[in-house]
């Protein structure tokens, strides 16, 4: 048997072969649906839930954290707890693991309570100073999951890829998510939607204007902008980590 290769035909074929319903299952109605479970999405969902909103956080991977998860292994960067907004970043600090940049911060102000806590952790676990491509434990996937899983008003949907949006005029009223393991589809309804996918996936599906690449110097006046616009974007790194186990192991 040769399966079809057209998108719509293949979708129907898969649905029939898996015995899935034709219409998506109702996942509920929310005040806010956050799509994307990286650091931005996690912080957005946590903040809204703590302010009393009923929130759904949809993440297409089995772990949270995005780049700052054990799947990708990019360390958190950026200064927080700085004047004139010393509380800006508290949620990131609560959610994220202690790492390289925390060490740098702590050395700048070694007398503060926060700095002493950071130095104590890094003294006990020196491997945490490895910024990128460190051991899986550096990225504390379990900490992120526990924080969001146990948050009141927050509903977590892992392994779910948003594949479509429904609109009323120019307003998004629902998104369709597909479980990447079972193939089953769900519909999420809400008053507000936050696109934290990192690639603007929800905006694209909704038909929003978008642009890729670099603007020209004539448009922006930026001294380092190219003379003409182009399609260059930031690169992506594939992080990896290896250790000598002194035993033969399967890859």
Label every model-predicted segment:
Residues 2-11, 21, 27, 47, ...:
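Conserved N-terminal/central alpha/beta ligand/cofactor-binding core
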Residues 24-38:
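Beta1/beta-strand and adjacent pyrophosphate-binding region of the FAD-binding site
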Residues 28-30, 182-192:
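Core beta-strand elements of the Rossmann-like FAD/NAD(P) dinucleotide-binding domain
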Residues 41:
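N-terminal Rossmann-fold NAD(P) dinucleotide-binding loop
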Residues 68-70, 168, 205-207, 251:
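Short acidic, glycine/serine/threonine-rich loops at helix termini
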Residues 166-187:
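Conserved beta-strand-loop-beta-strand element in the redox core of flavoprotein oxidoreductases
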Residues 192-250:
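Glycine-rich loop(s) and the adjacent beta-strand/alpha-helix scaffold that form part
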């Amino acid at each position: 048997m040769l399966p079809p290769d057209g998108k719509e035909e293949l979708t129907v074929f898969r649905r029939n072969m898996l015995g899935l319903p034709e219409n998506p299952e109702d996942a509920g109605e929310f005040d806010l649906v956050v799509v994307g479970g990286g650091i931005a999405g996690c912080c957005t969902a946590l903040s809204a839930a703590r302010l009393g909103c009923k929130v759904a956080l949809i993440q297409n991977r089995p772990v949270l954290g995005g780049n700052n998860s054990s799947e990708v292994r990019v360390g958190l960067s950026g200064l927080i707890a700085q004047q004139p907004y010393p509380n800006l970043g508290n949620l990131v600090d609560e959610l994220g693991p202690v790492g390289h940049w925390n060490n740098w911060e702590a050395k700048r102000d070694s007398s503060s309570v926060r700095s002493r806590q950071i130095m104590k952790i890094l003294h006990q676990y020196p491997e945490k100073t490895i910024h990128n491509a460190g051991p899986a434990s550096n990225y504390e996937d379990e900490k992120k999951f526990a924080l969001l899983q146990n948050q009141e008003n927050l509903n977590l949907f892992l392994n779910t890829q948003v594949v479509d949006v429904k609109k009323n005029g120019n307003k998004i009223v629902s998104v369709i998510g597909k479980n990447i393991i079972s193939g089953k589809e769900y519909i999420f309804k809400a008053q507000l939607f936050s696109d934290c996918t990192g690639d603007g996936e929800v905006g694209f599906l909704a038909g929003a204007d978008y642009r890729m690449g670099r603007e020209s110097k004539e448009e922006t006046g930026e001294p380092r902008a190219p003379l003409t616009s182009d399609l260059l974007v930031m690169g992506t790194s594939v992080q990896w980590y290896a250790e000598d186990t002194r035993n033969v192991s399967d890859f």
